[in-house]
Swiss-Prot record:
GO terms for molecular function: serine-type endopeptidase activity. This is Signal peptidase complex catalytic subunit sec11. Keywords: Endoplasmic reticulum, Glycoprotein, Hydrolase, Membrane, Protease, Signal-anchor, Transmembrane, Transmembrane helix. Residues 177-188 are annotated as: C-terminal short (CTS) helix. It is an enzyme of class 3 (hydrolase). Glycans are attached at residue 41. It comes from Talaromyces marneffei (strain ATCC 18224 / CBS 334.59 / QM 7333). The gene is sec11.
């Protein structure tokens, strides 16, 4: 009877150890993601190219690394932005930049003794597109606001690696297969 109880405790310990190891892996991945987000000053420091609008510079499925620490964005720079009201990142090149003087901000900063930096407005376009992105922007928006809309500027990429993400989102059954294989590996590893 005691040997059966000891075997059950051993299985319980093994199960708890596996759950804790899995939690450790998840929390480590989350902390790494947050650390990279803070270092790059970008809410999403790694994105996948979802369309062919930036060909030949970037292909669908390329993994992009973003940086958002620069004060200004230059014409010709490739940026990733979110359209207000939608949560799909768009990767396009800045084709025009200008600053818009905000009289209220200028008066407020002058009163506080702070320098006034006019907000930067950007117009973007995909390299493989004929027209600029004004049709993609939110209703009534003609330009992107540098501080509000830009997720980051592209600083590096790995070709094709992000295609796994695209496949998983386009074919939901692949997620089920992947989870089943992972579960099977956990069960087989226990023995």
């Amino acid at each position: 009877m005691l040997s059966a109880l000891g075997g059950n405790l051993s299985n319980a310990r093994q199960s708890i150890a596996q759950v804790l190891n899995f939690a450790l892996v998840l929390s480590t991945a989350f902390m790494l993601w947050k650390g990279v987000s803070i270092a790059s000053n970008s809410s999403s420091p790694i994105v996948v190219v979802l369309s062919g609008s930036m060909e030949p510079a970037f292909q669908r499925g390329d993994l992009l690394f973003l940086w958002n620490r620069a004060e200004r964005t230059e014409v010709g720079e490739i940026v990733v932005y979110n359209v207000r009201g939608r949560d799909i990142p768009i990767v396009h090149r800045v084709v025009r930049s200008y600053t818009e003087e905000d009289k209220k901000l200028k008066a407020k900063n002058k009163k506080a003794g702070l320098p006034t930096v006019a907000p930067q407005k950007l117009l973007t376009k995909g390299d493989n597109n004929l027209a600029d992105d004004t049709e993609l922007y939110a209703r009534g928006q003609d330009f992107l606001d540098r501080k509000e809309d830009i997720i980051g500027s592209v600083r590096g990429y790995i070709p094709g690696v992000g295609y796994v993400t695209i496949m998983l989102s386009e074919h939901p059954w692949l997620k089920t297969v992947l989870l089943g294989v992972m579960g099977l590996m956990v069960i087989l590893q226990r023995e």
